[in-house]
Amino acid sequence: MLIFPAIDLYDKKVVRLYKGDYSQMTIYSENPLQVAKDFQNAGATCIHIVDLEGAKFGTTPNLEIVKQIAQNTRLFIEVGGGIRNIETIKKYLDCGVNRVILGTAAVIDQEFLKKALNLYGDKIAVGVDVKDGLVAIKGWEEKSTYDCYEFCGLMQSLGVKNIICTDISKDGAMQGTNRQLYQELSKMFSLDITASGGVSTLDDVISLKNLNLYGAIIGKAYYIGSIKLQDALEAVR
């Protein structure tokens, strides 16, 4: 299982939200490139970046920072947040990003998703953000009508290979992961599943590894020191 340490960007800073709430934002660093270099120095091979401003407004205000990280590290980079057209996908891939995560766009515009998959194949992943059992959109501020399992089935049928599944109720709350959700998804679908939200302890990392998931994202737990990145990487080797 791969470990994806996370950088959430807002106003060119590294931040974390509590349960997806923009009014509960903590700034952890004003130097995202240094944070990414720290990940690499700890042994990480990949990184998960979310542009929270992009997710909220559908723009790319932090593109330059992502580009700096791509140019100055050897990390495999996946990026999500506000990517709602082919032009934005191209911008990210052209600046050195390896995989682009579609969230809202995959839910509300499946013709666009099909086009993106057709053009870029496995460079496209889909973020499945779950709130009260339904898939959330627009920076987690609205809920769609899709149930999580129905939506994952649809994604698989459209040719999506890789999903990042976040339980919003767990995200940033440091209360553990929704192991049952990931267990059910991995049994039902042949998707590469990355778990996100609530990975708080080394035990969480190990229990996700035992589900044979593709990846796990570590965010707040790294920033507050409850998981050492080296320990997490060691645990999944």
Which ranges hold each PLM region?
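Conserved, mostly hydrophobic/aromatic
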Residues: D8, F39, I47, Y92, ...
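Conserved anion-binding
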Residues: K12-V15, K19-S23, K90-L93, V97-D171
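Glycine-rich, proline-tolerant flexible connector loops at the mouths of alpha/beta enzymes
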Residues: C46-N62, T104, I164-Q175
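Conserved beta-strand positions in the central sheet of alpha/beta enzyme cores
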Residues: H48-D51, E78, I101-L102, A125, ...
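Glycine/small-residue-rich loop that forms an oxyanion/phosphate-binding "nest" at active or ligand-binding sites
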Residues: E53, P61-N118
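Alpha-helix-loop-beta-strand connector modules within alpha/beta enzyme cores
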Residues: F57-E78, K114-D129, M174-T201
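Catalytic cores of alpha/beta
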Residues: I77-G96, L181-Y182, S186-G215
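Glycine-rich phosphate-binding active-site loops on the catalytic face of alpha/beta enzymes
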Residues: D94-F112, G197-T201, L211-L229
